[in-house]
């Protein structure tokens, strides 16, 4: 039980800190833009690996390029997280694409374009 609470807290801290790095332009790669968001983080039960799911309101190759850039900068990102979060072992990060946000915008656009007729 205690391990699950620790895992959950660490996941939310990682979401917050990685999001702050992206937002404050702590990552200098131009492919990492302000339209990115950390959707969720999933840490393995042994707390060694973490999957970081990245979403964007921009569609297509922009998100793929940003995920590649984040994976290239994961050593730097882990170093920054070590400075900001006091944890014995920081999980190894891997960044993955998450299409939840773009799908939500797409569904919202469809709903807005529906015309309801008064009967």
Curated annotation (Swiss-Prot):
Keywords: Cytoplasm, Ribosome biogenesis. PROSITE patterns: RBFA. It comes from the Bacteria. It is found in: Cytoplasm. InterPro entries: KH_dom-like_a/b (IPR015946), RbfA (IPR000238), RbfA_dom_sf (IPR023799), Ribosome-bd_factorA_CS (IPR020053). GO terms for biological process: maturation of SSU-rRNA. GO terms for cellular component: cytosol. One of its GO terms (molecular function) is ribosomal small subunit binding. It holds the Pfam family RBFA. The keyword Cytoplasm applies. Gene3D superfamilies: 3.30.300.20. HAMAP family: RbfA. One of several proteins that assist in the late maturation steps of the functional core of the 30S ribosomal subunit. Associates with free 30S ribosomal subunits (but not with 30S subunits that are part of 70S ribosomes or polysomes). Required for efficient processing of 16S rRNA. May interact with the 5'-terminal helix region of 16S rRNA. Belongs to the RbfA family. NCBIfam families: rbfA (TIGR00082). Monomer. Binds 30S ribosomal subunits, but not 50S ribosomal subunits or 70S ribosomes. This is Ribosome-binding factor A. The gene is rbfA.
